[in-house]
UniProtKB/Swiss-Prot annotation:
Gene of this entry: utp23
Organism: Schizosaccharomyces pombe (strain 972 / ATCC 24843)
PANTHER family per the UniProt record, alphabetical: RRNA-PROCESSING PROTEIN UTP23 HOMOLOG
Name of the protein this chain belongs to: rRNA-processing protein utp23
Chain's role: Involved in rRNA-processing and ribosome biogenesis.
Locations listed in the record: Nucleus, Nucleolus
InterPro entries named in the record: Fcf1/Utp23, PIN-like_dom_sf, PIN_dom
Ranges where the record places region Disordered: 188-260
Molecular-function GO terms, alphabetical: RNA nuclease activity; small ribosomal subunit rRNA binding
């Protein structure tokens, strides 16, 4: 799957999570035709569905769809084996089996709502058209060996707009209740108090005068790179003697003794 398409699918499923409460693993209702087409193309159904919804899945199939596969058991042995690995969704049509499209529609569309948060994978265009009128129903089908997730339907977009409009005028407590996060009044009061204290503290810090930073002057040269000064000969205060006198210092002057 291309990166751009995967990103769009991930974003779309995130919308279903926020607005309609979808959670992983997603419950994917698969009809008999979708199962048969993917099996003939030798496509791993569970892996393909997981890539499409960008998350873990729980594949499911209704009893009516199983009956349709068993009606052609000689031709669809591989499909029946795959269907047995799916979770069986009890539709309640025991006495009289319905067509797969009617069965899936009765399971998904409960009073105009997708109560059980099903993702529907079907090749029936009439079934997809009927389920587009129900808000919050992700629809999957295969076209040219590519499994496709339909964009959000008009009913889903309208429901999204209505919920966003309602949330704009809600208080903090009402938004938490709508999102399913129940918190006590004491916790909300503590949060409000913490917010107020942090705001006051920020205002106090802004009003306090800021101490001027001491500007650093130009740095001196590196002492290791300076050439050492040459030591000068220190002069003594002792007077210098002439050369002819220096040699006579310490020597006794010899006198001849005069004899009488």
């Amino acid at each position: 799957m291309r990166q751009k398409r995967a990103k769009n699918y991930r974003k779309l499923m995130h919308t279903y999570q926020l607005l309609f409460g979808f959670r992983e693993p997603y419950q994917v209702l698969v009809d008999a035709d979708f199962l048969k087409d993917l099996s003939q193309q030798k496509i791993d159904i569970q892996a393909a569905l997981a890539r499409t919804v960008q998350g873990a899945i729980k594949p499911m199939i209704t009893q009516c769809c199983i009956r349709q596969l068993y009606s052609k058991s000689d031709e669809l042995k591989q499909e029946i084996r795959i269907a047995k690995s799916f979770e069986r969704r009890r539709c309640g049509h025991i006495d009289e089996a319905l067509s797969p499209s009617e069965c899936i529609q009765s399971v998904v569309n409960i009073n105009g709502r997708n109560k059980h948060r099903y993702v529907v994978a079907t090749q029936d265009p009439e079934l997809r058209q009927a389920l587009r009128s129900v808000p919050g129903v992700p629809l999957i089908y295969m076209k040219r060996s590519v499994v496709i997730l339909e964009p959000a339907s008009r009913a889903t977009l309208l429901e999204k707009h209505n919920k966003e409009s309602v949330q704009m005028g809600m208080s903090k407590e009402e938004k938490l209740l709508l999102s399913g996060k129940k918190r006590s009044a004491n916790e909300l009061a503590i949060d409000d108090q913490d917010t107020k204290e942090s705001t006051d503290l920020a205002g106090t810090e802004d009003s306090a005068p800021k101490a001027n930073k001491k500007r650093k002057g130009p740095k001196g040269p590196n002492p290791l790179s300076i050439k050492k000064r040459s030591s000068k000969n220190h002069t003594t205060d002792e007077p210098t003697l002439p050369v002819n006198i220096i040699g006579d210092v310490g020597e006794r002057k010899k006198h001849r003794r005069k004899r009488k």
